[in-house]
UniProtKB/Swiss-Prot annotation:
This is Formamidopyrimidine-DNA glycosylase. The keyword DNA-binding applies. Binds 1 zinc ion per subunit. Keywords: DNA damage, DNA repair, DNA-binding, Glycosidase, Hydrolase, Lyase, Metal-binding, Multifunctional enzyme, Zinc, Zinc-finger. The active site is at residues 2-3, 58, 260. It catalyses: Hydrolysis of DNA containing ring-opened 7-methylguanine residues, releasing 2,6-diamino-4-hydroxy-5-(N-methyl)formamidopyrimidine; 2'-deoxyribonucleotide-(2'-deoxyribose 5'-phosphate)-2'-deoxyribonucleotide-DNA = a 3'-end 2'-deoxyribonucleotide-(2,3-dehydro-2,3-deoxyribose 5'-phosphate)-DNA + a 5'-end 5'-phospho-2'-deoxyribonucleoside-DNA + H(+). Monomer. The lineage of its organism: Bacteria, Pseudomonadati, Pseudomonadota, Gammaproteobacteria, Pseudomonadales. InterPro entries: DNA_glyclase/AP_lyase_DNA-bd, DNA_glyclase_Znf_dom_DNA_BS, Formamido-pyr_DNA_Glyclase, FPG_cat, MutM-like_N-ter, Ribosomal_uS13-like_H2TH, Znf_DNA_glyclase/AP_lyase, Znf_FPG/IleRS. It holds the Pfam family H2TH. GO terms for molecular function: 8-oxo-7,8-dihydroguanine DNA N-glycosylase activity; class I DNA-(apurinic or apyrimidinic site) endonuclease activity; damaged DNA binding; zinc ion binding.
Length: 270
């Protein structure tokens, strides 16, 4: 599943080609995504100029002069730029054609993504309850410490809760907890302020570096320019269960936490 760095990589790849451009038409080949694509999307968006391409958590917000297209990549989706009129392949569900001659093409083999229309996106039901962005000053270790008090939930699903902080998905939670030396099974409420301060620093560092590296390509992700991400080449623990720890050589353990696979080092993480 594309996580925050992959979505931000997509945003950075497509924004320069969309912002300031006028939409000539929208072609919807299959509206059956997680939620149906609005039947009148072509009418609503065609003729409008795209003002800005923003991101909130893992949602891309394509802001037009009136209204915003809210897009989520789901489990296997991607948005990339192609020449308008390029014949579509299987699973290429939507083209947003621009007057420049390019088209923003949405591909989603598993159809778990979304393309929704809103006149007030930040108060949309999918966005209004989201926590702070991890790479802003609104998120820090103090927030993690305060929100964790009295929580018996394991720390890994706690930091993956979008009400606590957005965009810390399975890959980056696994890596950040390793970097901070915290066992992902520990109760969130039993972790000290000092360790949460360290964890917040590592979350910010790892997310920022993953964005710089173009995200993590495991199976389906490609950026808006059609290129894969390269952060997967530098993963310390995610997806490496049963292999030696890159720091101490101890065999990494793989467990299930909150219905997600989690890998950790029993020596480095306490």
């Amino acid at each position: 599943m594309p996580e925050l760095p992959e979505v931000e990589t997509t945003r950075r790849g497509i924004a320069p080609h969309l912002e300031g451009q006028r939409v000539s038409r929208v072609i919807v080949r299959d509206s059956r995504l997680r939620w149906p694509i609005p039947e009148d999307l072509d009418i609503r968006l065609s003729g409008q100029r795209i003002v800005q391409v923003d991101r909130r958590a893992k949602y891309l917000l394509i802001q037009a002069e009136v209204g915003t297209l809210i897009s989520h990549l789901g489990m296997s989706g991607n948005l990339r730029l192609v020449e308008a009129g390029l014949p579509a392949l299987k699973h290429e569900h939507v083209d947003i054609e621009l007057e420049s001659g390019l088209a923003l093409r949405y591909t989603d083999p598993r159809r778990f993504g979304a393309m929704l229309w809103s006149l007030d996106p930040h108060n949309h039901e999918l966005l209004i309850r989201l926590g702070p962005e991890p790479l802003t000053d609104l998120f820090d270790g103090e927030r993690l410490y305060e929100r964790s008090r009295g929580k018996s939930i394991a720390v890994k699903p706690f930091v993956m809760d979008n009400a606590v902080v957005v965009g810390v998905g399975n890959i980056y939670a696994t890596e950040a907890l390793f970097a901070a030396g915290i066992d992902p099974r520990r109760e969130a409420g039993g972790i000290s302020r000092a360790r949460y301060l360290k964890l917040a620093i590592e979350i910010k560092r790892i997310l920022a570096y993953a964005i710089e590296r173009g995200g993590t390509t495991l199976r389906d992700f490609i950026g808006g320019d059609g290129k894969p991400g390269y952060f997967q080449q530098e993963l310390f623990v995610y997806g490496r269960g049963g292999q030696p720890c890159k720091v101490c050589g101890t065999t990494l353990r793989e467990i299930k936490l909150g219905q997600r696979a989690s890998v950790y080092c029993p020596k480095c993480q306490r």
